[in-house]
UniProtKB/Swiss-Prot annotation:
GO terms for molecular function: 3'-5'-RNA exonuclease activity; magnesium ion binding; polyribonucleotide nucleotidyltransferase activity; RNA binding. Residues 622-690 form the S1 motif domain. The lineage of its organism: Bacteria, Pseudomonadati, Pseudomonadota, Gammaproteobacteria, Enterobacterales. Residues 689-711 are annotated as: Disordered. It comes from Escherichia coli O139:H28 (strain E24377A / ETEC). This is Polyribonucleotide nucleotidyltransferase. Keywords: Cytoplasm, Magnesium, Metal-binding, Nucleotidyltransferase, RNA-binding, Transferase. SUPFAM superfamilies: Eukaryotic type KH-domain (KH-domain type I), Nucleic acid-binding proteins, Polynucleotide phosphorylase/guanosine pentaphosphate synthase (PNPase/GPSI), domain 3, Ribonuclease PH domain 2-like, Ribosomal protein S5 domain 2-like. Belongs to the polyribonucleotide nucleotidyltransferase family. Mg(2+) binds at D486, D492.
């Protein structure tokens, strides 16, 4: 009854298995894809009929990780998986972006792709497996889909490209790039890099696209064996007469409207033209569909903007193809934040802050691939007022998570190492105005805010969004695209980096036929734009401030003998708790004996360092210390000699004559000179007041080991 159809093939160093026909047979299509023990089960369901009045393509991609895949039980209160994590949201977007442009124009039937991770090998990331699964399931389903696509991860290790590197190999790699595309063309790139050149990045894209052809070939073979019949779907016939009538009424007016450079004015005028045109046409014929008229008008708008760009005319806002909008760069705009910047590029503006915290502020991420700690956090907020609209304000949406991740990738390569700058850093970008490429404005703002906060970043970084308009062999690459150019163009191409190289590259391509040469032109044009923006940013701040903000915690680092860690922590943490309360600092101790003391006041930090040095100091036999009587017993007295250490002065060692009663000589809290006679194997200390008084120069406290101290 169950008749699985299986295909196996070698993909780089991994074996990939595609299996269908075993599970979820009521779904339109279902595929289990595995790559060396990482397995993702992907299903596709498509509705045979579109909803009446549907005017957009309702594609939903859900990606969900099950903890049983890693042999674990969820740590949440209810012990089951909840809402998607940030990582799951990002992978859902990664699957969505290359498949969305491959559905035919006019197809508005609901389609849902669900990818469930059911087994995971910690060395093989499930994202590529899920992308291959989505491509295979859609190709098998019979739904109109111009795929399949392939997907590949590319690393760069020892000046060589590596196909689908393992998690361990990625740690050594200067590049983490995911590329997806069809047999003929690249459709999507998502990457972060350690400042690689334009040629190295382009080489990685081309390498990944060439290598993924084996995936496409095997999916095609699987479709021949197990594919369902293609749906008999036809696009609605074009109403040429209606198109001509709409164009006669609106084309010239829309062409004029798209010469208005101010976004709000232009939008208002376009809305007036559209509503007047629709009203005129409905007055002529009540049976016309308003949605259809809207689509025709949108197509005219698109054609107006594109034909003008291709003819070499100025763009919507009057700029030439490679011009950047006017820049305004300010730092230190908020008085109490640790670092802040306001970055404005035309009608796009980001208010960006940087906040410094201690290691305790780091985010612990319990992921399927294992637990990790993130000491650099980047959050991007896109409130509705940034585009002059009203709307819901609340938890971040998919787009905000995706843009925040892209901006983080742009800055990550220049962040200092934790051993040089032991702070957790959180950057928040508030988009206050938006008209094109707010994620790249966030990269620029983050670089400025980090410098303003005194974070010793390795270089300033800037980002730029590029666009493309292509008809046949004629194409134009646009620098610093507006929102309208993004919607009406054929490619969205974002590049972030420093003067030395690229730190992040994201590409979303809506058409086939983007050649290596076009990508080369776009990358080189983006480099010129990036260097221009960096030049303007450097006029505002050209290096990180020499010191961190007075409102930020200062972290001082000292080294102690690892054997002494237990003395500083104390029983059940009693000593370290008392220390933090007494000194008003935060103290963290690592297994190698590194102690980090965080304080907003330098004096408090010095006090904490002094106390830790006292606690960890070695007691010297034969040395005289000043101690304080802490307990009196019949046979002598216990004396504290600093650093939490206590020794016994036997009754015979109190004076050089017979002592009948200890209290005749000593009182609680009395300071006395004591000489260390012996420290036994259990660390018990024998002291003598009698011998100490014979020596005239007592030491104030135990001598501490030399501290390795830095800020």
């Amino acid at each position: 009854m169950l008749n699985p159809i299986v295909r196996k093939f070698q993909y780089g160093q991994h074996t990939v298995t595609l299996e269908t026909g075993m599970m979820a047979r009521q779904a339109t299509a279902a595929v289990m894809v595995s790559m060396d023990d990482t397995a993702v089960f992907v299903t596709v369901v498509g509705q045979k009929k579109a909803k009446p009045g549907q005017d957009f393509f309702p594609l939903t991609v859900n990606y969900q990780e099950r903890t049983y895949a890693a042999g674990r039980i969820p740590g949440s209160f209810f012990r089951r998986e909840g809402r998607p994590s940030e990582g799951e949201t990002l992978i859902a977007r990664l699957i969505d972006r290359p498949i969305r442009p491959l559905f035919p124009e006019g197809f508005v039937n609901e389609v849902q792709v669900i990818a469930t991770v059911v087994s995971v090998n910690p060395q093989v990331n499930p994202d590529i497996v899920a992308m291959i699964g989505a491509s295979a399931a859609l190709s098998l389903s019979g739904i109109p889909f111009n795929g399949p696509i392939g997907a590949a991860r590319v690393g760069y290790i020892n000046d060589q490209y590596v196909l689908n590197p393992t998690q361990d190999e990625l740690k050594e790699s200067k590049l983490d790039l995911v590329v997806a595309g069809t047999e003929a063309a690249v459709l999507m790139v998502e990457s972060e890099a350690e400042l690689l050149s334009e040629d190295q990045m382009l080489g990685a894209v081309v390498f990944g696209h060439e290598q993924q052809q084996v995936v496409i070939q095997n999916i095609n073979e699987l479709v021949k064996e197990a594919g369902k019949p293609r749906w008999d779907w036809q696009p609605e016939p074009v109403n040429e007469a209606l198109n001509a009538r709409v164009a006669a009424l609106a084309e010239a007016r829309l062409s004029d409207a798209y010469r208005i450079t101010d976004k709000q004015e232009r939008y208002a005028q376009v809305d007036v033209i559209k509503s007047e045109t629709i009203a005129t046409l409905l007055a002529e014929d009540e049976t016309l569909d308003e949605n259809e008229l809207g689509e025709i008008l949108h197509a005219i708008e698109k054609n107006v903007v594109r034909s003008r760009v291709l003819a070499g005319e100025p763009r919507i806002d009057g700029r030439e193809k490679d011009m950047i909008r006017g820049l305004d760069v300010r730092t230190g705009v908020l008085p109490r934040t640790h670092g802040s910047a306001l970055f404005t590029r035309g009608e796009t503006q980001a208010l960006v802050t940087a906040t410094l915290g201690t290691a305790r502020d780091a985010q612990v991420l319990d992921e399927l691939m294992g637990e990790r700690t993130d000491t650099f956090l980047f959050h991007y907020n896109f409130p509705p007022y940034s585009v002059g609209e009203t709307g819901m304000v609340g938890s971040p949406k998919r787009r905000e998570i995706g843009h925040g991740r892209l901006a983080k990738r742009g800055v990550l390569a220049v962040m200092p190492d934790m051993d040089k700058f032991p702070y957790t850093v959180r950057v928040v970008s508030e988009i206050t105005e938006s008209n094109g490429s707010s994620s790249m404005a966030s990269v620029c703002g983050a670089s400025l805010a980090l410098m303003d906060a005194g974070v010793p970043i390795k270089a300033a970084v800037a980002g730029i969004a590029m666009g493309l308009v292509k008809e046949g062999d004629n194409y134009v690459v646009l620098s610093d695209i507006l929102g309208d150019e993004d919607h009406l163009g054929d490619m969205d191409f974002k590049v972030a980096g420093s003067r030395d190289g690229i730190s992040a590259l994201q590409m979303d391509i809506k058409i086939e036929g983007i050649t290596k040469e076009i990508m080369q032109v776009a990358l080189n044009q983006a480099k010129g734009a990036r260097l221009h923006i960096l030049g303007v940013m450097e006029q505002a701040i050209n290096a990180p401030r020499g010191d961190i903000s007075e409102f930020a915690p200062r972290i001082h680092t000292i080294k102690i003998n690892p054997d002494k860690i237990k003395d500083v922590i104390g029983k059940g943490g009693s000593v370290i708790r008392a220390l933090t309360e007494e000194t008003g600092t935060t103290i963290e101790i690592e297994d190698d004996g590194t102690v980090k003391i965080a304080a907003t006041d330098g004096e408090k930090a010095k006090h904490a360092i002094r106390r830790i040095e006292e606690i960890t100091a070695e007691i010297e036999v034969g040395r005289v210390y000043t101690g304080k009587v802490t307990r009196i017993v019949d046979f002598g007295a216990f004396v504290a000699i600093g650093g939490g250490k206590e020794g016994l002065v036997h009754i015979s060692q109190i004076a050089d004559k017979r002592v009948e009663k200890v209290t005749d000589y000593l009182q609680m809290g009395q300071e006395v000179p004591v000489k260390v006679l012996e420290v036994d194997r259990q660390g018990r200390i024998r002291l003598s007041i009698k011998e100490a008084t014979e020596q005239s120069q007592p030491a104030a406290a135990p001598e501490a080991p030399a501290a390795e101290q830095g800020e």
